[in-house]
Amino acid sequence: MRSNLENRYRALLRVALPGWYRAEREEEMVGLFLADRTDELDLEHGWPGWGEAGATVALGVRTRFAASGAPARTVALGDVVRLVALIGVLVQGAYGAQGVLSMLPVTLAEGDRLVAEVDPFTVVALVSNVAMLVGAVAMVTGFRTTAKVLFGLLSAVFLVGVGRDAGPEVVLGLLWQLPVWVTTAALLAGFHRDAPTPELKRWRWALAGSVLGAGALTAGNVLAYPYVLFALTSMLLVPVAVLVAGVVHLARRGGPVGALGLGWWLVVLLPVELVYAAYSVPLVAELVAAMAVVGVALLVVGLRGLRRPATAITP
């Protein structure tokens, strides 16, 4: 007869671990857990400790988003999450470059002379955008832990900032910060200790292009104000870039992992563009329609590509 402690531990395993892993390791894990838990009161009233629960949840993340030694669909899901994280790094690099240039505390005064006006909000915004850039660079240069810490701190700061808003601004704030939260979650879930660092050379080039493109357009917007073209291209750079990448992926009949990663990002970026469309920003309605069509097509292609038998592979 099972003790209450064993039942509670098995319940923890059911919640935290995928079925394929439990089928292979559950009995072994239960035996090891109960080996030194022999006290009758403990068996009747005891619970798995916080340390055990935390370790089990961490194992669950590593096995649900595995890089090897798991069913094919599980490995593919892990690859999708890691791709979402890397695309998110490019997105945050572009947003960071835009933010650093657009949030510089300057105003035009006395003709072309720039006069600095520093305030706490501007300082926090500037530091946050610099941290976003540093986190993106850290990730593509192999400093995964640094990147995860920086993006985690940014997510917390932005969450506090949204919590201070009221009314419709809360919803808009949530939509604006969704990309950084998605990036952080994907980094933490996908790049766990068992996941190898992928080849980063092409991602370094991609980040350089992302930062330089966003920076050039934003600088043009600042210097050429009030010309609308610069503002429009700067605002739409990230979703247009992801959209073009998605179209190219479909045209080349790329794999399901790439399709799901790009499709997911089109879904994440779509709500903010819908807000722009509500304010009748030029070209945004057409962009929203294209993002919706291409995003759905990518997700359908990706999900179809993952429909294959899942075979457990024990290392």
Regions found by a protein language model. Give the residues of each.
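Cytosolic juxtamembrane regions of integral membrane proteins
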Residues: 31, 35-107
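Short, well-ordered alpha-helical segments
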Residues: 27-29
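Hydrophobic alpha-helical bundles in membrane proteins
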Residues: 74-315
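Short, charge-enriched, intrinsically disordered boundary segments that mark the beginning
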Residues: 1-12
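P-loop NTPase catalytic cores that bind/hydrolyze ATP
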Residues: 24
